[in-house]
């Protein structure tokens, strides 16, 4: 089995999610929380994609990424040559943040709002495969 960028994303996301399932501090430090972003914690636009609400949420996102990501990654390598994997990774990471911009605008003062999951980035990969 080849170690692909997609597989690395899946493994890293699973490790962080499993760790956060049993560690509330990690969950609170990485989750997307708009008031914390307003205090300069911009990393939360990205780190929330490493967290999932439960095993089903994690499994659905990572299985979907596995089935669609490999093809997109391969096509990016064909289209962009040696930069294909880097562009694929950049698309995934930037999609994490981009999909949260409307949410941030709507909830920037909402102290009760939190968000997590990689669904926005996984959706970007799925749409890229079309």
Question: Which functions belong to the PLM regions below?
Answer:
Residues 1-130:
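A detector for small-residue-rich transmembrane helices and their helix-helix packing motifs
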């Amino acid at each position: 089995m080849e170690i692909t960028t997609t597989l690395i994303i899946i493994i890293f996301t699973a490790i962080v999610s499993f760790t956060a399932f049993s560690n509330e501090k990690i969950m609170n430090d990485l989750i997307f929380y708009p008031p914390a972003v307003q205090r300069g914690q911009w990393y939360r636009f990205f780190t929330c994609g490493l967290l999932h609400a439960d095993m089903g949420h994690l499994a659905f996102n990572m299985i979907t990424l596995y089935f669609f990501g490999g093809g997109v990654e391969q096509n990016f390598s064909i289209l962009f040559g040696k930069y294909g994997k880097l562009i694929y990774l950049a698309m995934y990471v930037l999609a994490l943040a981009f999909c949260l911009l409307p949410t941030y605008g709507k909830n920037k003062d909402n102290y009760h709002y939190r968000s997590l999951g990689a669904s926005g980035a996984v959706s970007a990969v799925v749409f890229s495969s079309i």
